[in-house]
Design a protein with these regions (language model features):
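Beta-strand segments within the central parallel beta-sheet cores of soluble alpha/beta enzyme folds
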Residues: 61-69, 96-100, 125-133, 164-167
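Acidic, glycine-rich active-site loops and adjacent beta-strand->loop/helix elements
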Residues: 2, 69-75, 102-108, 132-137, ...
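Flexible, glycine-rich active-site loops centered on histidine and acidic residues
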Residues: 120, 124-153
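Conserved catalytic cysteine-centered active-site region
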Residues: 24-26, 31-40, 72-127
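Condensing-enzyme catalytic core mediating Claisen C-C bond formation in acyl metabolism
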Residues: 1-41, 144-177
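Phosphate/pyrophosphate-binding loops at sites that engage ATP/ADP/AMP, CoA/4′-phosphopantetheine
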Residues: 21, 48-64
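Buried hydrophobic positions in well-ordered alpha/beta secondary-structure cores of metabolic enzymes
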Residues: 52, 63-66, 111, 154
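Short, contiguous clusters of charged residues that form electrostatic/catalytic patches at enzyme active sites
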Residues: 43-51, 110-113
Length: 177
């Protein structure tokens, strides 16, 4: 997990907005992290993946798929996944498949479910890497929903957590906020 070091407590936000308890008790939020001028979705993803691979001691070549879930594009023609391949290339891995799932709050869920399905459907023992990264920067009325963070997860067979079916989906063309 990577969260930026710049934070604002939700107690401060409640005081500013005159709504004591709304964010801390109502939304169970303690603080909001914000990116510094030298941070973006790519740098957070690179940091989270580097740390996770180091701590897990998984061989880079054991990852056969990289799926990113985000709503924070940094380049409209280049995926965050392609930036992450820089780390894998440094370890001789150039063939990890996968894509970015660009879809508001569902992007990370889609990346996870796609990876679970890939692990189940393939005859390989390789794992999938799921990276969920976002930077929310909403208008002043919705500032309590702002924030930034990244999580990297490994998905593989015989994992300590199992994702079971059935699944339900409901999609509509709507404005979230």
């Amino acid at each position: 997990i990577y969260t930026p070091s710049k934070v604002v407590t939700q107690k401060e936000m409640e005081k500013h907005d005159g709504c004591e308890g709304k964010y801390t008790n109502g939304l169970y939020q303690d603080e909001i992290g914000f990116c510094d001028e030298n941070e973006d979705a790519v740098s957070m993803a690179l940091t989270a993946v580097s740390r996770m691979m180091q701590k897990s001691r998984v061989n880079w070549s054991d990852v056969g798929r990289i799926e990113v879930g985000t709503e924070s594009l940094v380049d409209r023609s280049k995926s965050i996944k392609s930036f992450l391949m820089r780390l894998f290339s440094e370890h001789g891995v150039h063939n990890a498949c996968g894509v970015d799932n660009y879809h508001a709050c569902y992007g990370g869920t889609a990346a996870l479910l796609n990876s679970v399905d890939w692990v189940r459907s393939t005859g390989t023992d390789q794992m999938a890497l799921v990276v969920c990264v976002d930077i929310a920067d909403l208008n002043e009325e919705q500032a309590f929903l702002n924030g930034a963070s990244c999580v990297a997860m490994l998905v593989g067979k015989n994992a300590p957590m199992e994702i079971l079916g059935p699944r339900g989906h409901h999609f509509m063309d709507t404005t979230d906020f």
